[in-house]
Amino acid sequence: MTEVDDGCGGRLRGSVLLEDECDLKQECETPTHSLVQGRDPPVVVVWRNVVLMSVLHTAAVYGLVLLPSASAYTLLAFCFVSSALGITAGAHRLWSHRSYKASLPLRIFLAVANSMGFQNDIYEWARDHRVHHKYSETDADPHNASRGFFFAHIGWLLVKKHPKVIENGQKLELSDLKNDRVVMFQRRFYKHSVVVMCFLIPAMLPWFLWAESLWVGYFVPVLLRYALVLNATWLVNSAAHMWGNQPYDVNINPRENRFVTFSAIGEGFHNYHHTFPYDYATSEFGCRLNLTTCFINLMCVLGLAKDCRRVPTELVMARVKRTGDGSHRSG
């Protein structure tokens, strides 16, 4: 079995996975052609979501207008990064892919940060993401990019899920999530945690610490920040499935997109990620333009994370030569 140093004080297993990891890997990597496409059912618009998203983005534009008068820029950045890490390091890399192990304090922090991000609870987010990987670009993909940019970006949230998304989501093995006390606690109290973490605390802190008006505090660190994090995440589903190069596998839609990488703190190395979904860094290049990987590495140094799973360089290069588009550049 090939082992390399993981940079987290342990040994990585390369592409060789333990039995329970093989089950998760299979859930994420079944070929998409195994799903037979049929006639699309009628699209049912969820008008409540249309109204809420319209109001949110209108309020975010107003937040931009108020931005010059705001004093809590540091808090705005902190809330953006914190809520983004709750998605990227938490719901995505830890709970969807189990690409590293986190201690209880770190899992609690990531669950709290995930509630600040307000993109469905961890259980639902991870379930839908596993379906996305297993049936990417098919009717069972929640944000199927073959239906166009708008649908992949935000449209999928404005209509009822395709029946195949629900059907195939119910078939997944999710016992690891069900057995995680932090995940299930957050799911049970999700609405309460969102009210506190996404809306109350980011609005109240500027008022309490910097005498910022509650009006500015609500529209800038709350609504503007929330809309920015949402769109950064959505760009991974839309732009990173449409524009960019494919140095690792030209046979799949996901691309390497630098703008998305910067916006989503490291999630834009998407061709690599869909080729090697169990790699904790989601990139061949470690911390480069990858704040999430830097955060996980720091947690390893502090003893709060371990067993980061990484793909050996020789396997990456073999895949580049076999299925890449020729655009790969080392280093």
Curated annotation (Swiss-Prot):
Pfam families: FA_desaturase (PF00487). One of its GO terms (biological process) is monounsaturated fatty acid biosynthetic process. Residues 68-71, 210-213 are lumenal. Expression is highest in liver, followed by brain and intestine, and lowest in spleen. Also expressed in heart, gill and muscle. A motif (Histidine box-1) lies at residues 92-97. Fe cation 2 binds at residues 132, 241, 270, 274. Induction: Expression is transcriptionally down-regulated by intraperitoneal injection of human leptin at 24 hours and 48 hours post-injection. The lineage of its organism: Eukaryota, Metazoa, Chordata, Craniata, Vertebrata. This is Acyl-CoA desaturase 1. It comes from Tachysurus fulvidraco. CDD domains: Delta9-FADS-like (cd03505). Its main location: endoplasmic reticulum. The histidine box domains are involved in binding the catalytic metal ions. Signal peptide: none annotated. Fe cation 1 binds at residues 92, 97, 129, 133, 273.
